[in-house]
Amino acid sequence: MPGNIVLIGFMGSGKTTVGRLLARDLGWSFLDTDTMVEERLGLPVKEIFAREGEEFFREVEKEAVARVATARQAVIATGGGAVLCGVNVKLLREGNKVVWLQVRPETALKRAGLDDSRPLLQGREPRDIAALLRRREPYYAFADIYIDTDGKEAAAVAREIKEALKAWLESLT
């Protein structure tokens, strides 16, 4: 039984930032599947999408998810689209607590839209982001816990996750 905390959610929801803080607070390791893909291929996500396309990226991402699924006491930040693959969902759920970091489209665009490393946000209007987020929401709904990140500092979100998972965390010790 792995016993990890898996953070899922749309781009700009705070998975990486919150994940690092939460891992530090818990004394756990932090794993980021996007970073793992970048390290494996030696390219940033944006270039992987541009050169090879999203389908290729998702295949390599699936390998990264399979690797993190065997971790123990780690906080895992997934790419925003990792949950589009049923195999990933199965691996991420098994023995772990999955937390959906929810974000409004406007907030996602403000947090991540200016970052040119986000290929699916490039050149998008707020209504496009809202439509993409709506299409993805059903894929995030399997999470054990939903946390709204709008208007909150990352440290407050990390504390909220710890509090929501308090009994589960105590059961691991």
From Swiss-Prot:
Keywords: Amino-acid biosynthesis, Aromatic amino acid biosynthesis, ATP-binding, Cytoplasm, Kinase, Magnesium, Metal-binding, Nucleotide-binding, Transferase
Pfam family membership, one: SKI
Enzyme Commission (EC) number: 2.7.1.71
Coiled-coil stretches: none
Purpose: Catalyzes the specific phosphorylation of the 3-hydroxyl group of shikimic acid using ATP as a cosubstrate.
GO terms under cellular component: cytosol
Alphabetized CDD domains for the sequence: SK
Subcellular location: Cytoplasm
Gene Ontology MF, one: ATP binding
Organism: Moorella thermoacetica (strain ATCC 39073 / JCM 9320)
Necessary cofactors: Mg(2+)
Residues that, per the record, bind Mg(2+): 16
Reaction(s) the record says it catalyses: shikimate + ATP = 3-phosphoshikimate + ADP + H(+)
Name this protein carries in UniProt: Shikimate kinase
Family note: Belongs to the shikimate kinase family.
Pathway membership: Metabolic intermediate biosynthesis; chorismate biosynthesis; chorismate from D-erythrose 4-phosphate and phosphoenolpyruvate: step 5/7
Binding site for ATP: 12-17, 118
Name of the gene: aroK
Subunit structure and binding partners: Monomer.
